[in-house]
Amino acid sequence: MDRFELLGPLPREGTTTVLEASAGTGKTFALAGLVTRYLAETAATLDEMLLITFNRAASRELRERVRGQIVEAVGALQGDAPPSGELVEHLLRGSDAERAQKRSRLRDALANFDAATIATTHEFCGSVLKSLGVAGDNAADVELKESLTDLVTEIVDDRYLANFGRQETDPELTYAEALALALAVVDDPCAQLRPPDPEPGSKAAVRLRFAAEVLEELERRKGRLRAQGFNDLLIRLATALEAADSPARDRMRERWRIVLVDEFQDTDPMQWRVLERAFSRHSALILIGDPKQAIYGFRGGDIHTYLKAAGTADARYTLGVNWRSDRALVESLQTVLRDATLGHADIVVRGTDAHHAGHRLASAPRPAPFRLRVVKRHTLGYDGTAHVPIEALRRHIPDDLAADVAALLASGATFAGRPVVAADIAVIVEHHKDARACRNALAEAGIPAIYTGDTDVFASQAAKDWLCLLEAFDAPQRSGLVRAAACTMFFGETAESLAAEGDALTDRVAGTLREWADHARHRGVAAVFQAAQLAGMGRRVLSQRGGERDLTDLAHIAQLLHEAAHRERLGLPGLRDWLRRQAKAGAGPPEHNRRLDSDAAAVQIMTVFVAKGLQFPIVYLPFAFNRNVRSDDILLYHDDGTRCLYIGGKDGGAQRRTVEGLNRVEAAHDNLRLTYVALTRAQSQVVAWWAPTFDEVNGGLSRLLRGRRPGQSQVPDRCTPRVTDEQAWAVFAQWEAAGGPSVEESVIGARSSLEKPVPVPGFEVRHFHRRIDTTWRRTSYSDLVRGSEAVTVTSEPAAGGRADEVEIAVVAAPGSGADLTSPLAALPSGASFGSLVHAVLETADPAAPDLAAELEAQVRRHAPWWTVDVDHAQLAPELARALLPMHDTPLGPAAAALTLRQIGVRDRLRELDFEMPLAGGDLRGRSPDVSLADVGELLASHLPGDDPLSPYADRLGSAGLGDQPLRGYLAGSIDVVLRLPGQRYLVVDYKTNHLGDTAADYGFERLTEAMLHSDYPLQALLYVVVLHRFLRWRQRDYAPARHLGGVLYLFVRGMCGAATPVTAGHPAGVFTWNPPTALVVALSDLLDRGRLQS
C-alpha cells in the first residue's frame, strides 16, 4: 500500500479513497490539510464540504484544527507570517495572481466558517432529516433523546410484570437478566438476534420473545411520545436513501461534493449504508481511520464494515510519519509490532518513520524507551510452572509501579528540556479493580494520582445523599426521613449529635428541608445546592478526607438533576424516581462518569478506552499481559460477515458452544487491538509487566511477545500454557536482542524520597500592561437599546422574557376607523404573556386540520412555564380562541395577500437563532470603530423622505444610542422567516404590545409610532441583515433584490381575522416595511468592515 502524500493530487469527485492511519500519524492534521487545499486550489467552498467524526469532543477538535489551518495559511499568503510547514509552502507556490486567488478563497472560507458542516454522524443525520422534512420521513416535533435507557427500563418493568408477575415458580428470566437483555438489543439495532429458531418453550425462546416484545413496545411508545433515539436518525435516513429516485439522495449529493469521514474504523453497518447510498460514486468520499485501533465493537463499531468499505475503495493509502513518539521508541515498538496481524489478514501493523529523531526523556534512572519488567515466581514464593494468583500480583505490581514512578520523579529526569512531573505519566489498564490498586499504591507512596473511570457517579455516596434529601423533601413530616437526611453531607450530623439534640435537631432540619424544597420548586435543584453551600456544606465536606471527591460528585449530581428536571419537566417526586432509576441502572452514558476532583498535577490512571486519542511522555502498562476470558449471557459475534447477537442464554447446547468459540476469537482480536492502542500512547517511554498467571495465555502483550518470535507476523489467539520463568525469559531476551523491549526483573527496591530541598525563589510584583478592549462584547438588539441608558460591559446578552416588547406603547393620538374589538382584549399583557404567545406561535402547525385544537394543545404545553394572570382551566381555550383570528388576517401586499394559515410549516423557518460576527468579531487585531451612529448615517442616506421610518435615522444619531459600539458578536433569534411564492423571504416578528382594545388602535399610523417609540426599526434592520447573510450561503443564485421581501411586524392584538379593516393596503395589526436592498447590503458590509479589513 502506497503512502499518502498530502501535497499530491487531490481525490476526485466520484471516487472513494481510504487513508489508513497508524497511532500518532496525524489523522486530524491530514484532514485539516485536505480541507485547506480543496478550498485554496479548487472552486469548492466550505458549505460544499461535509466532515464527519464519531463523538462531540472530536468534532470540536476537528473544527478548531481546520479553522486554525486556514488561519495559518491566510497569514502566510498575506505575508503576515512565515510558512510553518510543507503544506503552507505548497500553497505559496505559483504566480501572484494564483496566490491572490488562494488568499481570497481562504478568506471567504473564514468569513463563512459557520457554513462548514463538521459534526458527529448523528448530528449530521439529524440536520439532514430536519432539512429534508417529508422527504426524510421526519416529523418536526419529534424530540431527540440522547439516551433511551429510562424508557427501556419502564418497558421492561411493564413487560416483566405482564409475563412473569403471576408465575408461582421462579421465572425463566430474572429481572436483571431481562433489563440487560433489553438494553443490549436496543443498543445494537444492526445485529441479527440469534438463535433464529429456538425450540418452543425453551429458555432461549422466552428470551427472544421478551426481546421482541420490548422492541415492539419501544417503537409504539416512541411514536406516542414523539421521541426518537440516535439510532433512529440513522435508520430513517438510510430508509430515505433507499429508493432509486430518492429525493434525499439528490439533495445530499447536490449540497456536499466533498465528504471526509474521520475515525472510520468505528463505523457500523447502518452508518456506512447512509454514506455509501448518499455519496459513493458521486462525491469525493475520503475515509480516514486506523483499523488497528478498532476497539469499540461493544458500542456498535464494526471492523467488518470498515474492511468491506475499504475493499471497495478506488484508492488506499497509509499515513507513514509518526508525529508522537521518539524514534527510539518507534523502532523498539516496531520490532514487536511490525507486520503483526491484529485479528484479520488486512489489519496489519505497517512501518512508520518517526518525526522526533532524538530521545526527549533524559536522565531517567532506566532510560530504555520500551521496558518489560518480568515478575519471577520466586519473588512471591512460587516455583516451577505454578500460576501466581492475580490477587497477589494486584499487590506486587502496583507497589513496583509506585516505586518506579517515585524513582523517576526523584531522579531529576527531564522531558523535552523540562523536569518530569507526575502529570507526564499515565497508567493504562483495562479493569477498574486494576486501576484502583494502582491508585492506592501511588497514594501510599505519596504520589498524587487521579482515576475518574472507576464508577458511575450515580453509584457514589453523593448520589445516595441526594436521593435521601429528595425523599425527605417529599415527606418532611416523617422524622425517620428527616433524621436520615440530617446524616447526609448536606447537614453533616452524626448519630451522636442526633442522640444528644433529639427532637430539637429534627425540627430544625425539617424546617430547612421545607425551605430548600420551596427553593427547588421555584428556582430548580441548583438553588438547593447553592443554599446548602451558603449553609456551610462546602467548608464542612472539604475539611474531611476525600472531601474534594465528595463535593465534586455532589455538584455533578446537582447538574444532572437540574438537566433532567428541565428536559423531562419533572417535579420533586419525579426527580426522586428518576435518580432512583439511574442508581439502579448502573453504568450509563459518558456524562455519568465521575469527574476529576482536582486539577493538581497528578499521575493519570485511565482505561484504554479513555486513553485512545491521548498521548503522554511516559506510559505504564501494569496488567496488559493478563486477560480473563469469560462467557456472558449475551454474545456478540459475526457469522459470515453478518453481525449477530446471541441472546439465547447459557443453556443453548452445541449451538451455544459454537457461538462461544466465535465470540472468544473476536474478543481475542479486540484485545490485540486494545494492546496496540495502549502501547502507542507514549511519546518517550513505555513500561510494561509480565507475570506467570493463569490468564496470561490470553493477554494481548503475552501473545505478542511470548506467543511468537521476532519476524513472525501471525499472533496466536492463545499462548502455550505453563512455561517456566527461564523459558519465558529466554523468549523475551530474543526480542531484546532484536531491538524490542529491555527486559528487567520486577523486584521492589527502596522507594526514593520525593522530598528534595527546593530553593525559594524571590518574588516580585507582576504588572499588567495590556489594554482591555471594553467595546468588544457579545450583545443583542435588546442590549443595544438598553445600553443607551447605561453602558456596561457584559459577557452574555440578557436572558429571560420578551425584552423587546413594552406593555403599552406611547402614541400621539387615538386611532380612527372600524371599532372591531381585539380578540385579545380580555387577556392580560406583559412580558410573561408575550413569551407564552410566542412559544405557542412558534410550535403550532398552521396547517393542522383543527387549528383551534392545535393552538389549545400548544397553550397547554407551554402554559406551565409562564405565569399568566388568567384562571388556569380557562387559559388554554380562551387564548386559543383569541389567536385563531390572526391566522386568517390578510398579511397585505408584501405577503401576496396570503394569511398565516396559508403558509405551511415547510415554508417557515421558526426561531432562527443567530450569532453574527460584527467588526472585530472573529479575527484578532484592531479593527475600525463602528457604532450605531454609523448605522443612522446609512439610514439617512438610503431612505427616501416619505419612508415611514426615515425619522429613526435621527434617533440613531442621538447621544447614548448612537454611541453604542458594534464590536464583537450580535446574538438573537428571529421569530419566523416566511418563504413566499417566487422564493421571496419575509422576516416576521410577533408583537403582543397593548395599543388599545379595537382594531382601530392598530392602524398603520399608530403602528408606525409604536415602531419608532420602541426602537423596532433597529431590530428590523439587524434581522434583515441576518437573513441576507443566511440566504447568501443557503439560497442558490441568491440575489438580494429578488429574494429579500422585507419585514412584517405582526401586532397580534390588532389582527381580527378576515374582517380586519384595511387602510391604504395596510391591514390593521400588520406593519410592513421593505428597506431598500442597497441599505441592507451596505449595512451588512458596514458591520463586517473590521473583519474584511483585518
From Swiss-Prot:
Domain UvrD-like helicase C-terminal: 357-613
Keywords associated with the record: ATP-binding, DNA damage, DNA repair, DNA-binding, Exonuclease, Helicase, Hydrolase, Isomerase, Magnesium, Metal-binding, Nuclease, Nucleotide-binding
GO cellular component assignments: cytosol; exodeoxyribonuclease V complex; peptidoglycan-based cell wall; plasma membrane
Active site residues per record: 989
EC number, UniProt record: 3.1.11.5, 5.6.2.4
Annotated positions binding Mg(2+): 838, 975, 989
Cofactor: Mg(2+)
Superkingdom of the organism of origin: Bacteria
Binding annotation for ATP: 21-28
BP GO terms, sorted: double-strand break repair via homologous recombination; recombinational repair
Stretches of the chain forming a coiled coil according to its record: none
Chain spans, region DNA-binding and helicase activity, interacts with RecC: 1-713
Segments for region (Nuclease activity, interacts with RecD and RecA): 775-1094
Pfam families from the UniProt entry: PDDEXK_1, UvrD-helicase, UvrD_C
Gene Ontology MF annotations: 3'-5' DNA helicase activity; ATP binding; ATP hydrolysis activity; DNA binding; exodeoxyribonuclease V activity; magnesium ion binding
Catalysed reaction equations from the record: Exonucleolytic cleavage (in the presence of ATP) in either 5'- to 3'- or 3'- to 5'-direction to yield 5'-phosphooligonucleotides; Couples ATP hydrolysis with the unwinding of duplex DNA by translocating in the 3'-5' direction; ATP + H2O = ADP + phosphate + H(+)
InterPro entries, per the entry: DNA_helicase_UvrD-like_C (IPR014017), DNA_helicase_UvrD/REP (IPR000212), P-loop_NTPase (IPR027417), PDDEXK-like_dom_sf (IPR011604), PDDEXK_AddAB-type (IPR038726), RecB (IPR004586), Restrct_endonuc-II-like (IPR011335), UvrD-like_ATP-bd (IPR014016)
Cofactor binding description: Binds 1 Mg(2+) ion per subunit.
Database matches in SUPFAM superfamilies: P-loop containing nucleoside triphosphate hydrolases (SSF52540), Restriction endonuclease-like (SSF52980)
Cited function: A helicase/nuclease that prepares dsDNA breaks (DSB) for recombinational DNA repair. Binds to DSBs and unwinds DNA via a highly rapid and processive ATP-dependent bidirectional helicase activity. In the holoenzyme this subunit contributes ATPase, 3'-5' helicase, exonuclease activity and loads RecA onto ssDNA. Unlike the case in E.coli, suppresses RecA-dependent homologous recombination, is instead required for single-strand annealing pathway repair of DSB.
Domain notes: The N-terminal DNA-binding domain is a ssDNA-dependent ATPase and has ATP-dependent 3'-5' helicase function. This domain interacts with RecC. The C-terminal domain has nuclease activity and interacts with RecD. It interacts with RecA, facilitating its loading onto ssDNA.
Assembly notes: Heterotrimer of RecB, RecC and RecD. All subunits contribute to DNA-binding. Interacts with RecA. Co-immunoprecipitates with DarG in the presence and absence of darT.
Note: In the RecBCD complex, RecB has a slow 3'-5' helicase, an exonuclease activity and loads RecA onto ssDNA, RecD has a fast 5'-3' helicase activity, while RecC stimulates the ATPase and processivity of the RecB helicase and contributes to recognition of the Chi site.
Name of the molecule in the record: RecBCD enzyme subunit RecB
Protein source organism: Mycobacterium tuberculosis (strain ATCC 25618 / H37Rv)
Lineage: Bacteria, Bacillati, Actinomycetota, Actinomycetes, Mycobacteriales
